[in-house]
Amino acid sequence: MQSATPETFDEAYYQRFYFDKKTSVVDPMHVERLGAFVCSYLQYLRVPVQRVLDVGCGIGLWRDIVARHFPQASFHGVELSEYLCRRYGWEQGSVVNYEARQPFDLVICQGVLPYLSPGDL
């Protein structure tokens, strides 16, 4: 198995698997609950969150969750899909070789690993 390429995640892919309710593979409520748990736990631990990195951010489901819990935090999305980078303004990149220029307080990489080959894990 090879890791997914940017060509895999074109507009048709997202229309079919994210934006069409009949064929969607993502449950926004599940992501909402997961994100609320993660953010609430960080708040409970009193972890200061000012800068958030979401690698493999997709359509940005975590962005609004983070903003509700940490309104002062900046959110930076990195995404392999050229289509989503154009649509949402993400930085194009891959979890396999992404190198952040600055440190982040919270790094999210949810739902990405199934798209990677064993050699890229």
Roles of regions detected by a PLM:
Residues 59-97:
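Class I SAM-dependent methyltransferase SAM/SAH-binding core
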Residues 111-115:
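Short catalytic micro-motifs in class I SAM-dependent methyltransferases
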Residues 30-48:
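Conserved alpha-helix/loop element of class I SAM-dependent methyltransferases that forms part
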Residues 1-20:
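N-terminal, positively charged/glycine-rich alpha-helical extensions of SAM-dependent methyltransferases
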Residues 50-58:
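Conserved class I S-adenosyl-L-methionine
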Residues 108:
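A conserved beta-strand element that flanks and buttresses the S-adenosyl-L-methionine
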Residues 116-121:
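A short, conserved alpha-helix within the catalytic core of class I
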